C-alpha cells in the first residue's frame, strides 16, 4: 500500500521529469549554458581560455559563497513556527503579540552555542543562544537571550575581553582554561554564571530540551505611557534534559551536530517542540528596594519574589528549506523593538543594542534588513536608500522625493509611538563607575545551596576538571575564594579537590 508520503515523493519525481526538459541551465544573467562539463580550451589538451565566461562566473561565485561567520554564536540552527498568546497583556504593553488571547504571531528561532566556530561540536560546555524573532504587524520584534538566565559580566565594555578568553588562544589556536579562569578570577561578578554553567545545565541534551531567558530586563509601556520592567522566560514543554561530560564525549565522537539533527528530526516527525513564555514584573519605583540591582544581568529574578506569569506558547513546526537563506542569513538583534517594548538601563544590554546591528552589517551588508528572512510583514516606509543590493528606492511613492518632510508626500511619524517619558533612577550626571549594588556572591551561594547532593558533586567535578588544567596556583586560589565567599562548603570542596588546605581560605 502506497503511503501518503510515498505518493508525494512520486508526484515530485514525476513533476521533475515532466518539467526537466523545459529547465535550461543558464548563467547568472540568464544566458543559456551549452556545456557545464568541459571548459573552453586551446585544442583538446590545451590551456583553458580566459574567455570562458561561464567558467569564470562559476568559480567566482564559488569563491564568494562564504560570508563572515558570527563572531559569537557561530554554531547554530533554526526553525520556524508561531507564538499563540494565552493572556491579554494590554494593561502593561502595546506590543501587538501580547494584546489578545488566541492571537498567533509567526516566529523564527535560532539556537546556538557561544564560543566556538560554525563547524564545532554541539556538546561543548557553553551557554546556548535562544533568539526568537516575532513577525508582527508593527515590525519585527526580537527576544535575543540564552538558555541560562544570567551572564558573566554586567558592562559591555568587558565583552570583547571576555569573548577573547573563551575563544582559542591566538598562539596555540586552542581553547585554554588558563585564559578564561584568569579572567574570571579577577571578575567576581562572574561567580554566579560560572556556577550555573558548570552544573549539568552547562551541556543541554538538545535545543528542544532547554529553557530560555531574555537575560536582561526590558520595559513594557502601555497606551497610557505607564512603564513596568520585566524579564522573559521560556519554559520547555519537552522537559529540561542535560548531558554528563561522559555522555557528551560519547556523542561528540560520533556526531558533532547532534542537537541540530535532533531538532530537525523531531519537526520532520511532527513532534513539534513547544515552549511556554512567562514574564516577571518590577515596578520602576521598586527598583531600589532589593539587595541587588535588578537591571544587572549577572542577577536572577527569583520566581518566589517575582512570580512567573504565563502569556503564551511557542510552537516550532517548520524546518529551514535553505539553511543559508533562512538561518545563516537571519539577523537577530535586541534592538529590534516594537511599540510597547523599550530597552532598560542594563549596561550590558545598552552595548548589545549597538553591537548586534553592527555585526549584522559586517556579516550581511548594510541592507541586511532586506534579506527575505529579515523582512517585516508590514510595509517599510522610510528614505534610507542605496548601498549594496538595495531595493528600497523602487518602493518610494515618488522616486524624486527621497527626503522628509516634503510638501509633495505627506509621510509623517506618528506621535503615539514616541518612547515613554520616565524619571530615571539615577541623577542626571555623567559617571564612569561600577553599579552601586554589586552583591557578587549572594545569588551564587543561593543557587549552590538549591542544588541536590548529586548536582553539587557534578558541579565540583566539572569545575575541578577545568581548574586542574590551570597552571597558576594564584588563579586557582582566587577562584576558590570566589566560591568560598558564595558558600563556605562550595569553596572548601573545590579547594580540597585541588589539593589546597582549608587554612588557606580562612
Regions found by a protein language model. Give the residues of each.
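Generic low-polarity alpha-helical segments
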Residues: 1, 18-21
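Bacterial N-terminal signal peptides that target proteins for export
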Residues: 1-8
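Bacterial N-terminal signal peptides
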Residues: 9-19
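Active-site-adjacent core segments of small-molecule enzymes
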Residues: 23-506
